[in-house]
Amino acid sequence: MTLIASLSLPPPAIQRQSLSEFHNLPAKSQSFNCQFRSSSSPLSSLHSSSLSNFLDFRLRRRNSGLVPVVACSTTPFMGRVGLHWRDGNMSLLSFCGGTDVTEKADSSQFWSALLPFVVALTAVAALSYPPSFTWVSKDLYAPALGGIMLSIGIQLSVDDFALAFKRPVPLSVGFVAQYVLKPLLGVLVANAFGMPRTFYAGFILTCCVAGAQLSSYASSLSKADVAMSILLTSSTTIASVIFTPLLSGLLIGSVVPVDAVAMSKSILQVVLVPITLGLVLNTYAKPVVTLLQPVMPFVAMVCTSLCIGSPLSINRSQILSAEGLGLIVPIVTFHAVAFALGYWFSKIPGLRQEEEVSRTISLCTGMQSSTLAGLLASQFLGSSQAVPAACSVVVMAIMGLCLASFWGNGFRIRDVLSLSTPQSTGYTAES
């Protein structure tokens, strides 16, 4: 079967439309039109008014049988492919996880969805034209990271931390996965691949930082526990003031000297202070937060781009060397295993969590704040040690959101892959 369609940019959500009527058509060649109209969404204003608000497919029936139909979003959100059997008929599934998710969409989701593409473009720009990011000095790196942390803080309230006392088990499981399993996995991977000393300490440091802010968006895509994701990310980020210097001293202190006290002070300045400021603003200055919230996701995205591009451009020659290219396999391996480890650790008898919580812990374990690791590596270990952290941002953003999209769809990979193979079903589709 071959489906040919010329699609303009579709709206962020599509209502479900059954194709059961199609099977009642006579066997001879006839046409059947389906229109999939958009539902209301807070993001509707983001789309140009000149764009069509519906998709129109014309299916031509030639023989008896079923017509598999694929719907793929080309909105700024992660594209989704849905294939759903119901009573022997096919249905188009709604985009973006349903209307309830769409109604909660805001600018933060829009910029978060763009982040993987911005990360990839930043890496390409930094390596192909280093002057585009070499101007980002260490003096600018810390404020940029502070901007990312402030964007976390303005989303928090005192009530959020009260959840920690109501749900201690999943939070504890996430902490253990973050600060025990992940650092040990990093040491195992680094030694297994014989990572050179040029990058070893920076790689281990990257494995010892807290979860990334992007994991909260990934949790929403994967239909996981978003509230737990925000709580876990925020808590581990605050706890990094103690755990990251402690783990770094224990795991890499024998390789390179680590000033744990100075590192703790640095984390306090660029992590805890901005988050606390954001929390205070969200508690006592709501009008200020109302003004900041629409722009902070964009600010965080720009800051992330600067924190990635700087170490990549400065260390371009080392990255493109044989040793630098050798980082790809261990970093991909680390993140892939970390996602699996976080998920299955939460399924151990006695600790077993609900599926939504397990997905959250998996994403928080596999996606860490590599930008923080890059800053600490630049300040305390040398500029070359920041390279693993910069590479990690690119890998974890792409892998994490792909995993989240897969979970969010709820469909098997082989169902999606089978659609790319032409089959003789006797149907064609014309847009």
Curated annotation (Swiss-Prot):
Primary location class: membrane
Could you point out where the transit peptide sits in the sequence?
1-70
Q: Which residue ranges traverse the bilayer?
A: 110-130, 145-165, 169-189, 198-218, 238-258, 261-281, 288-308, 325-345, 387-407
Give the way it sits in the membrane. Answer: Multi-pass membrane protein
Cellular component GO terms, alphabetical? chloroplast envelope; membrane
Q: Where in the cell is it found?
A: Membrane; Plastid, Chloroplast envelope
Tell me which InterPro entries the record gives: BilAc:Na_symport/Acr3 (IPR002657), Bilac:Na_transpt (IPR004710), Na+/solute_symporter_sf (IPR038770)
Reading the lineage from the top rank, the first entry is Eukaryota
Pfam family, any one: SBF
Give UniProt keywords alphabetically: Chloroplast, Membrane, Plastid, Transit peptide, Transmembrane, Transmembrane helix, Transport
Q: What does this protein do?
A: May function as sodium-coupled metabolite transporter across the chloroplast envelope.
Q: Which family does it belong to?
A: Belongs to the bile acid:sodium symporter (BASS) (TC 2.A.28) family.
Instruction: From the Swiss-Prot or TrEMBL record, give the protein name.
Output: Probable sodium/metabolite cotransporter BASS3, chloroplastic
Its source organism is Arabidopsis thaliana (Mouse-ear cress)
